[in-house]
From Swiss-Prot:
Annotated binding of substrate, by residue: 109
EC number: 5.4.99.12
Naturally occurring in which organism (per UniProt): Staphylococcus epidermidis (strain ATCC 12228 / FDA PCI 1200)
Subunit: Homodimer.
Keywords: Isomerase, tRNA processing
Isomerase listed as a keyword: yes
Family membership noted in the UniProt record: Belongs to the tRNA pseudouridine synthase TruA family.
Gene Ontology MF: a single term: tRNA pseudouridine(38-40) synthase activity
Protein's name in the database: tRNA pseudouridine synthase A
InterPro entries listed in its UniProt record: PsdUridine_synth_cat_dom_sf, PsdUridine_synth_TruA, PsdUridine_synth_TruA_a/b_dom, PsdUridine_synth_TruA_C, TruA/RsuA/RluB/E/F_N
Active-site residues, Swiss-Prot/TrEMBL: 51
Biological process (GO), any one: tRNA pseudouridine synthesis
Pfam families: PseudoU_synth_1
Gene: truA
């Protein structure tokens, strides 16, 4: 039986989602609970592997079990055993061929920035502080340039190992908030550190050090040395996982380009 679990977590005290040889991770917390319940190791499969310090409003993982436990009981048992910085929002059964990673057709991230005369210690780890004056309109114009299908080689970590760095962005915008701004970006998928590099670049645009019309050339050049800065992880939130094309179409229209991942478990 395959179980799908929806969770949220604050990433401050985690070394990321994926299990590490040493250190606290989200995967480690759940696999420890499942091992205790099953009396053997049970691997979980996430929709996304967030990095150290990154938060999630919505994240999914699935696992296989032989235990006959009601979904509400799964939720109760996990939440009772979990630390306060992780919460199980929902548990449900899925088809045996469903796979969290391969059936994920899109993700939305939100990056939070606050501004002011000084840092707020109560926002430490959850939002990023920028004290310079920023031109939000100019930043939003630059953000719009990223919408569409592009090769984002120049806007990701040089450690990125995937073969294709082509991704499609359906949404890329600056949203003004009471104390600063949020950068909201939705796409077919994201490369290592891609959102944080985009944010760092947009902040440079806001400071007047870059221009919106720099974007097409930077995308074409595919050179990370031309976009050297990376924003800290503190303000980054995985906000939504799209597990069906219908969800994406409902929000962004029927003409969008959807990238389907081949599920290895179906073959």
């Amino acid at each position: 039986m395959r179980i799908l679990v929806e969770i949220a977590y604050q990433g401050n005290q985690f070394l990321g989602f994926q299990i590490q040889q040493q250190g606290r991770t989200v995967q480690q917390q759940f696999e420890k609970i499942l091992k205790r319940m099953h009396k053997h190791h049970v691997r979980i499969h996430p929709s996304s592997r967030t990095d150290r310090g990154v938060h999630a409003y919505q994240q999914f993982f699935h696992f296989d079990t032989e235990l006959n436990i009601d979904n509400k009981q799964w939720q109760y048992a996990m939440n009772r055993a979990l630390p306060d910085d992780i919460y199980v929002k929902n548990v449900r059964n899925v088809d045996e061929y469903f796979h969290c990673r391969y059936d994920c057709v899109g993700k939305r991230y939100r990056y939070k920035v606050y501004q002011g005369n000084h840092r707020n210690p109560f926002k430490s780890g959850t939002e990023t502080f920028v004290n310079e004056t920023l031109d939000y309109d100019k930043m939003n114009k630059a953000a719009q340039e990223f919408i569409g299908t592009h090769d984002f080689t120049g806007f990701c970590s040089q450690k990125t190992e995937v073969e294709s760095k082509v991704r499609t962005l359906y949404q890329s915008e600056i949203v003004a908030t009471k104390e600063g701004f949020d950068y909201v970006v939705t796409g077919s998928g994201f490369l290592y550190n891609m959102v944080r590099v985009l944010v760092a670049f947009l902040i440079e645009v806001g400071k007047g050090k870059r221009e919106p019309n720099d974007v097409p050339k930077l995308l074409e050049d595919k050179n990370r040395n031309n976009v050297p800065l990376t924003a800290p992880p503190d303000g980054l939130y995985l906000e939504k996982i799209y597990l069906s094309p219908e969800e994406l179409i409902q929000e962004y229209g029927k003409d969008i380009k959807i990238h389907y991942k081949k599920s290895l478990e179906k073959h």
